[in-house]
Amino acid sequence: MAVSRLDRLFILLDTGTTPVTRKAAAQQLGEVVKLHPHELNNLLSKVLIYLRSANWDTRIAAGQAVEAIVKNVPEWNPVPRTRQEPTSESSMEDSPTTERLNFDRFDICRLLQHGASLLGSAGAEFEVQDEKSGEVDPKERIARQRKLLQKKLGLNMGEAIGMSTEELFNDEDLDYTPTSASFVNKQPTLQAAELIDSEFRAGMSNRQKNKAKRMAKLFAKQRSRDAVETNEKSNDSTDGEPEEKRRKIANVVINQSANDSKVLIDNIPDSSSLIEETNEWPLESFCEELCNDLFNPSWEVRHGAGTGLREILKAHGKSGGKMGDSTLEEMIQQHQEWLEDLVIRLLCVFALDRFGDFVSDEVVAPVRETCAQTLGVVLKHMNETGVHKTVDVLLKLLTQEQWEVRHGGLLGIKYALAVRQDVINTLLPKVLTRIIEGLQDLDDDVRAVAAASLVPVVESLVYLQTQKVPFIINTLWDALLELDDLTASTNSIMTLLSSLLTYPQVQQCSIQQSLTVLVPRVWPFLHHTISSVRRAALETLFTLLSTQDQNSSSWLIPILPDMLRHIFQFCVLESSQEILDLIHKVWMELLSKASVQYVVAAACPWMGAWLCLMMQPSHLPIDLNMLLEVKARAKEKTGGKVRQGQSQNKEVLQEYIAGADTIMEDPATRDFVVMRARMMAAKLLGALCCCICDPGVNVVTQEIKPAESLGQLLLFHLNSKSALQRISVALVICEWAALQKECKAVTLAVQPRLLDILSEHLYYDEIAVPFTRMQNECKQLISSLADVHIEVGNRVNNNVLTIDQASDLVTTVFNEATSSFDLNPQVLQQLDSKRQQVQMTVTETNQEWQVLQLRVHTFAACAVVSLQQLPEKLNPIIKPLMETIKKEENTLVQNYAAQCIAKLLQQCTTRTPCPNSKIIKNLCSSLCVDPYLTPCVTCPVPTQSGQENSKGSTSEKDGMHHTVTKHRGIITLYRHQKAAFAITSRRGPTPKAVKAQIADLPAGSSGNILVELDEAQKPYLVQRRGAEFALTTIVKHFGGEMAVKLPHLWDAMVGPLRNTIDINNFDGKSLLDKGDSPAQELVNSLQVFETAAASMDSELHPLLVQHLPHLYMCLQYPSTAVRHMAARCVGVMSKIATMETMNIFLEKVLPWLGAIDDSVKQEGAIEALACVMEQLDVGIVPYIVLLVVPVLGRMSDQTDSVRFMATQCFATLIRLMPLEAGIPDPPNMSAELIQLKAKERHFLEQLLDGKKLENYKIPVPINAELRKYQQDGVNWLAFLNKYKLHGILCDDMGLGKTLQSICILAGDHCHRAQEYARSKLAECMPLPSLVVCPPTLTGHWVDEVGKFCSREYLNPLHYTGPPTERIRLQHQVKRHNLIVASYDVVRNDIDFFRNIKFNYCILDEGHVIKNGKTKLSKAVKQLTANYRIILSGTPIQNNVLELWSLFDFLMPGFLGTERQFAARYGKPILASRDARSSSREQEAGVLAMDALHRQVLPFLLRRMKEDVLQDLPPKIIQDYYCTLSPLQVQLYEDFAKSRAKCDVDETVSSATLSEETEKPKLKATGHVFQALQYLRKLCNHPALVLTPQHPEFKTTAEKLAVQNSSLHDIQHAPKLSALKQLLLDCGLGNGSTSESGTESVVAQHRILIFCQLKSMLDIVEHDLLKPHLPSVTYLRLDGSIPPGQRHSIVSRFNNDPSIDVLLLTTHVGGLGLNLTGADTVVFVEHDWNPMRDLQAMDRAHRIGQKRVVNVYRLITRGTLEEKIMGLQKFKMNIANTVISQENSSLQSMGTDQLLDLFTLDKDGKAEKADTSTSGKASMKSILENLSDLWDQEQYDSEYSLENFMHSLK
């Protein structure tokens, strides 16, 4: 059954997989109110259910829905009554002053004394609900309680993981003694709502009494309905919902009243309880409901109520409580009283709520926090007196003993201060004392809120309460002493302290000596486990330092050594880039504020230790003696709460460089973060070296100057044999030299040594272990050879082998030695095995050494270049730098070398001889080394790797549709398809997302970029990436002087372009004759151009623009590779010089698309457009209008490559089209283009907005009056015709798709005939059209054409019959202009049909070709037609891939190849639905869905019956449950024990295990299908399975014979009994008589009976109708009836009302037929595919039906059938979400409209989930049984004060 669009939006609120999806659904609900204001209360009543949901996401989404809805409700501002006007009766009744709560009667202390606490819940969910509990045996009751309690606590999974839960609680714990009512009444607490009503209200007004009466009337019916709603809504979150509850709501009634066209589906709450009174604010009743919910025992309901009220008041805070027919003064008073009433309710929540979430490091009280935000919104609109009264009550809460009450009070004050800054002068003095007490509270969560409450009013605090600030500052400093890793208030206190210290006044009032004592209190937080605390600590230090000048920093001197040590070791241990940058900022500020002498004195003793820390090996823990330990004072707790683990002693954790949390990362990632930490440490020490080398501290009279000491220290480490020591010192020298131009003492000490290092080849200490292992293994190998009398000792060094000698040993020496001896094969095998082991060790050792050697030489070279004292010979410097560019896998090292090369080139510009040209040439060669990026002219795309070839020819053909040759093809298209092939071919789970701390890697790279690459590609990628880093760095370094100072680079970019291309006389043939060499040179030049241009200084952009004509000429170069590179360069140019590039492109290049005689031009132009679109992304939007139509024209191009590329471009443009509206014309656009743009925009408006379509006047008479929506459909089809487009008309079944198609067919044939008669042009020549449909409908189509249109205009040929008949008909085709044939006939005669060019090809029920791999689909796609139209009421039946096949017929390539489609849409969508998916993957899935919907939107037209047919009677669907007969039960149970069932279990299990890697075997799947078929047949009738071959047949037959029964008695088939009763109830078969007493000729009801199987129809006919209901007349329509005769049966049934019943199979009778003669539909069986059942029932429920249609579905209870119905509902959600009513009005598609397609990836998972609890449970299933709250990030987002304040603006 169809779910309405509105219901789907609500379903998304609850089940949307991402917050983005839920928010989009919420926004669309707001749009509904905008268009249908009268639906306000209906919508709000539905939203209320979701505000009460147990699911956090659902409540937040419901709050967003409330926000979206109320934003579209006009502000309530009734016209005030003047004092002279008489008041209405209703307002006379009211007494506003008495009906509201007010402060005068409110006593918060009394409430605290007598009110019951509001906890997480009332505990009702843990009670056993059993009306007969008194009669049950106590043991049974306890057993049931135990089971229920285990389930609720998530302990029912214990046994599955081998954990016993029996002893957690015993029977005595569960037994209870009923408590007498009198005892309960003596309890001193009352429910909050009761207490408020009884104690604080003065009485009820007349209006309230009247309202109470109305509510009482509604209460009875609402109570039962609420129960049902609650059960229904909790199904998702409650696993153990009893089956009986679900069945209560199984009967679904679709009701449609005469004056309302909306369809009501499922249980919709009665909105009458929320109907507003005429003089009331429209939202009054809804707010009252929410106010009542504030005191619900369940925290989730309270939270939802607070959320709803907050959103309403943001938009309508000025309207609450106002009554119409009141004076202005009365309205103001009513408003303030209403606000006061609400404030008091919120204060009661603060007082009584005790629920808090302790999941994270800080308590989050969702109810109190949300109510505090709501209070903030209320106070915004309250008068000043009310604000002060509110604050007075909040202050009373701060005096209470319970920490939760104080916490709530401070939350209220926090938002009050933030919102009412206008009265801060009076508010702040009132509350400040209490807040300061809060800062000293024993409870750390209270302290956290107290600190947070002052952050937004820091400025006011400093200026208004200056005298209190010193005390607050001291309090905060003292609080730092009490904080530790587990305290909650750390972040808030650090933030407040940092905020206060930014004000000079605060600095002045701080005593200098005190900072010396206070600042060290920050040290522990530099090493805090939570990054936000570390950040806050650094920001506090930076604030302290930046607000001081050097003269007033005396407090810094005593603590300077410790501060330097803490910050440096913090740097070494940190892994976050953001925090590392902040460390550098604080360090530099510290060095600038402290005197140089003091810095040198403090730092020099520790310089050596710091260098050692920086040199720490990455795999070894740091010696804790080298770290300055931080001792935080232990916090003594005397009250409040203690978190788990707070009292435990902390373990001493091992520390590693770059953080212990990264130690388990993969080697590439770990190497990246460690190198980043070393480089940052080098920056800090480099800055420190500047201080040490300062002339002021290096006085001549000193014995030992600091600079000289530094030089000696650095030299000591450079003389070490450790690679890490050398690398670290070289890095420090680089950073120091970058900051300070010259320091002779250090330079003289280290420069010679650095030059020596560049020529040294050492075996470093770091490879000692593998080197020693290599020596030992080599000696063992030599010894093993000696054992078999092979002496090799004389050929190798007997002492220590070098790596080269070891390598020779295991290759040349070993092979020569063994080959000269005749060894036993077994001995030789053993020796070779040892050799391979040694060879592996040698290779590993060599690789480690090579990496270290290269890095040592590279950083030494960088140091020499940084010192700016280059030696005479530059080769030792240049060589390692270039090698790093070519070979280094760590991007940080490559980047460092790239920066050094840029500096080297700068220093060498004036040098003779100058090495720059050689360096540039080498870099350009390296840049072009990757054939995947820089194509080779002779072979433009690299040959397929063996891996792809191994996939087999079929998959390769499927994935790589486009072939590229030397002269033809589009490389961009090839790469898109190859990428899609790679993505869809990848097996296994999606790779994990890169963690946050390594996410900030250089663009285009990551720490683990080489993990998934083919080993053969890896060197190319590394070398190309290094060259790219180097060239972009060089270009940025030289800026605007690049062309002058580096003429060789400029020439490499544009030289071949100028020399090869003559823009005035371009001759492709002569270029071809010159051979491949100039073309390859041009390709390489363009690669350099692309790389360098993107980073070039804007001063050089005009020079680049001068070469645009050359680039455009290259787009028609005969070489594919040149065209490709030129297209990429045009793309880059469009990004850096958009206006100039696009103007020339539109004027010169875009017209080439129409050059159908020159495919080279077309390929170049379309590839360039693709590259421009890729580079500009949304920047292309201003030009879209001018691009769409030319691209559209190429979507049917004869050249495959052009067609595929054009469809891809068009698909992208279509998605961006909605953004085009309102974008101004780009500057400097020519007048011609602006004029053309206006013309093309008209087309776009029609494409995107169906309402702007031109009305199409059908030029031929049609014998029917078209309804408006049918005329709209014809207009749409005519629009497609005009622009040579194709589409899917997917109107709901029964809306006249056939008629609309006939109209456009007849109209276009007439138009073509007239045009041809006038012009005689070949393109207007009359052509026949083809309609392909299911065989049942061919006759129907011919009749419909004859009925609606004269043969003069459409002359159909019914092409059917056996082959000989069809051959005869083929000769008649020329005499007809319309051929109607079935799909099978077209498939069989495709050789005939493919040779005819058709005008229209219409596929009726076109979803038949949903599987593109069937012979039928392949045949249909061979048809040639000007226009292709698909008619289908259900274009998507199971999954989204079906849509690809339909569009592959309409517009091949529009959605890419099947693999591209799967890569772009299928893979992300599937990944986003995986339980393990990251938030990034979920977002990608949502965006993919949005992109797909947007892309296909203009080519789908969808209207639903309930939207367009006001006169169609309702359709009522009812499920009719039957219970299995004893015989069926026996057979069902026998099957459950059978071998067949075991086979199925094994198959499903193996399929589950293999689903990540491969699909289950076909044969195994067949077992499952057979088993399912068996059970389905058994549910229908035992005779269908109990055949003579059945093992139980004989026994059963004998048993029945004894009982005088047979297998065909209807008592054994409850469905037949139920069907008989239904027929009798409909007045059939019981000899029904008319009112006159005579037997009625025509029955009151006529019935369609649908079965799946022909054999079941036989049973219905022979076992039920003939023996039991002989008077029932019936016809039959199934597969046994020849297609040619089926139409006559349909006509006879429709035209002869005396035929009571039509028996049909769903497959034959469920498509396209018009059976409006029936008004009742019975499904004896159900289809796996819900669309088929839907189509079947709509045979009767369609245009022409005058009576209510009743649909009965016979379902056997508790069997497979119930699961089939559940599966149907799931698939319906898929189809309705993709192809929705939005397609009826294209303008309704906003950028935030998303689709939520899949919740499962294939059918079997639903059942699989149910069976997964047997045996050992997976961790996933255990976790799913436990409920939890949102994580901390989500809380931060929801309760961010900054976000909240922004939302009030």
Curated annotation (Swiss-Prot):
GO terms for molecular function: ATP binding; ATP hydrolysis activity; ATP-dependent activity, acting on DNA; DNA binding; helicase activity; TBP-class protein binding; transcription coregulator activity. InterPro entries: ARM-like, ARM-type_fold, Helicase_ATP-bd, Helicase_C-like, Mot1, Mot1_ATP-bd, Mot1_central_dom, P-loop_NTPase. Associates with TBP to form B-TFIID. Binds DRAP1. Regulates transcription in association with TATA binding protein (TBP). Removes TBP from the TATA box in an ATP-dependent manner. HEAT repeats lie at residues 385-422, 426-463, 513-550, 554-596, 818-855, 872-910, 1102-1139, 1182-1219. It comes from the Eukaryota. Residues 1278-1453 form the Helicase ATP-binding domain. One of its GO terms (cellular component) is intracellular membrane-bounded organelle. A motif (Nuclear localization signal) lies at residues 191-207. The modification Phosphoserine is found at residues 91, 95. Residues 223-236 have a biased composition (Basic and acidic residues). It is found in: Nucleus. ATP binds at residues 1291-1298. SMART domains: DEXDc (SM00487), HELICc (SM00490). GO terms for biological process: negative regulation of chromatin binding; negative regulation of DNA-templated transcription. Belongs to the SNF2/RAD54 helicase family. Residues 1636-1790 form the Helicase C-terminal domain. Keywords: ATP-binding, DNA-binding, Helicase, Hydrolase, Nucleotide-binding, Nucleus, Phosphoprotein, Repeat. Residues 85-97 have a biased composition (Polar residues). A motif (DEGH box) lies at residues 1404-1407. Residues 77-97, 219-247 are annotated as: Disordered. This is TATA-binding protein-associated factor 172. Its EC number is 3.6.4.-. CDD domains: DEXHc_Mot1, SF2_C_SNF.
